[in-house]
A protein has these predicted regions:
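Surface-exposed amphipathic alpha-helices with a cationic face
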Residues: 1-9, 158, 232-240
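An anion/phosphate-binding loop that grips the pyrophosphate of nucleotide cofactors and donors
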Residues: 184
């Protein structure tokens, strides 16, 4: 109320985080909260009762209503049917998605200058890893989007190399993966996470037990799944002309397998045109100019210990500086 609305002269409205962002009807309403998302738990009938009992002044309700309606009027089209001249997934949207993927993908390692691959030297390329052929675009929670289509890494490579033989193995059979890597002129591994590993929608009993996930947190390991790390360690040395594409939204430790492969690209969640951008980068059409938004430690022991089962958290005076 004081800083946001009075000192900063903010004329919009305040809404809560999704699901349990509000924990007290009276405190939230009197503190300036105006909209509870995404299900009504503490507002609604409870808020009506709080007003009737005099615990929340009607002025708070009037202020919230004016701010919400004012915002709606400011951004509402006169004719909602004409709000979008083109459908989602139009040419402009596709071009923007491709631009974001091209500019976001980050080169982490390039031993022996493996990348870019030389197209004229590649008659056979092996693409190995479960995520190579899956549409991994991010979380399945409140941030989930539904693109018209998704270009996977495998599809992007096949489209980029129409005259080469593209061998795909999901990595579950290490002997098949080794054979594919050994006979190929180049190898692309795809490994990492999806919404089951680090999405906010994940409940504890649905999380991967290897990572110790809870609500998307990886409590027990910042590395890859055990089978993927083992795949890179065993199959990587079968071909020195190799690159790893990492999929995920946060730090992925590489210490146990990085020396087994040539190049490493961090693709994050590259979106609907991610496979196209990855293929362009692998073959030098586009420079991987993205920057890491987080630190990749060499090993997990370099990080400070975290006590996950604590009931209180204490920050010293210099926290945040």
């Amino acid at each position: 109320n004081q800083v946001l609305k009075e000192e900063w002269d903010f004329d919009g409205f305040v809404m809560s985080d999704f699901n349990w962002g509000v924990r007290d009807t009276v405190e939230a309403a009197n503190g300036g909260q105006m909209m509870e998302m995404c299900e009504t738990k503490y507002f609604g009938e409870r808020l009506v009762k709080a007003v009737e009992e005099g615990k929340v002044p009607m002025e708070r309700i009037d202020d919230a209503a004016v701010r919400i309606v004012r915002t709606l009027l400011a951004f509402t089209e006169a004719d909602p049917k004409k709000a979008l001249e083109e459908e989602p997934g139009c040419k402009e949207h596709i071009n923007l998605a491709l631009k974001c993927a091209r500019e976001g993908i980050t080169l982490i390692q390039n031993e022996g200058k493996v990348l870019p691959f030389h197209e004229e030297e590649i008659k056979t390329i092996a693409v190995i890893g479960r995520l190579a052929d899956e549409e991994v675009t991010g979380d399945h929670g409140s941030s989930r989007v539904f693109p018209a289509y998704v270009v996977t890494p495998l599809q992007g490579i096949r489209k980029r190399l129409p005259h080469a033989e593209v061998i795909y193995e999901d990595g579950s059979d290490l002997e098949k993966a080794k054979t594919a890597a050994g006979k190929a002129d180049a190898v692309v591994f795809v490994a990492g996470y999806d919404y089951n590993d680090e999405g906010e929608y994940v409940l504890k009993d649905e999380s991967d037990t290897e990572l110790g996930g809870y609500g998307g947190d990886r409590l027990d390991s910042l590395g890859l799944h055990r089978d993927e790390a083992e795949m890179l360690k065993q199959v990587g040395p079968c071909n020195s002309n190799s690159a790893v594409i990492l999929i995920g939204g946060n730090t992925i430790l590489m210490d146990e397998w990085r020396e087994a492969v040539g190049a490493v690209l961090m693709a994050y969640y590259p979106g609907m045109e991610g496979g196209t951008a990855l293929a362009e980068i692998l073959f030098g059409d586009i420079n991987p100019s993205g920057k890491l938004p987080f630190v990749l430690p060499y090993k997990e022991s370099d990080l400070p210990e975290v006590v996950w089962n604590t009931t209180e958290q204490w920050y010293d005076y210099y926290h945040g500086y």
